[in-house]
Amino acid sequence: MNNLELERLLNEKLSTDRINDYAPNGLQVEGKAEIQKIITGVTASQALIDYAVAQQADAILVHHGYFWKSENPCIRGMKGKRIKTLLVNDINLYGYHLPLDVHPELGNNAKLAQLLGISDLQPLENSATSIPVWGTLKDPVTAEEFAQRIEQVLHRKPLICTENGPHLIRKVSICTGGGQGYIDLAAAQGCDAFITGEVSEQTIHSAREQGIHFFAAGHHATERYGIKALGEWLAAEYGLDVEFKDIDNPA
């Protein structure tokens, strides 16, 4: 497949024109024109790039790419090495950030909800492109049971604050990655629990004082599944050779 055609298909699938982001979505570093082998991963780290080189990949597709708003534009140091490796090996780099978080089928929130048994997702914000969402568990569970479920699914213990929440959890809000700032909105919307990737000092106070269970399950861990699903969709729809590579990150 042509590299620009691949960008067009991905942009269309993820409706990138509908979402304001603080990083460019699409083809970020241009490589060879024809693509057959794609490596997908959460972040365009040097380790992922080196793996793609070893696999003779034509492209890398990630959730966390480059050129973030307010980022130093100079191509040097760690950033220079990464981009140089891509250019020397003629590898295309595609990045999709918020459009992949919010996609109703392939998105990080949607895939994590599916894995945790949370259904009927609705926007938490008053917007069709709300970043956080909420849904319901078919069978209510205790906070301890929900923490165990998260650990079983993500293969890591979540950081939890479950001191003053309700006895049973049914209504759950999700914002994968660094979404801890949405806890107040989740509490205001009557959610029993809020799950995200990261935690800040003030997050715990918000959880305690507003009576909502809080689970921080890892930025990387909560965002594996959207990019993996996007790659699987490409392989199924267009016959491309796509491999997901998980570069472990405890954060």
Predicted regions and their residues:
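Active-site catalytic microenvironments in core metabolic enzymes, especially phosphate/sugar-handling
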Residues: M1-A251
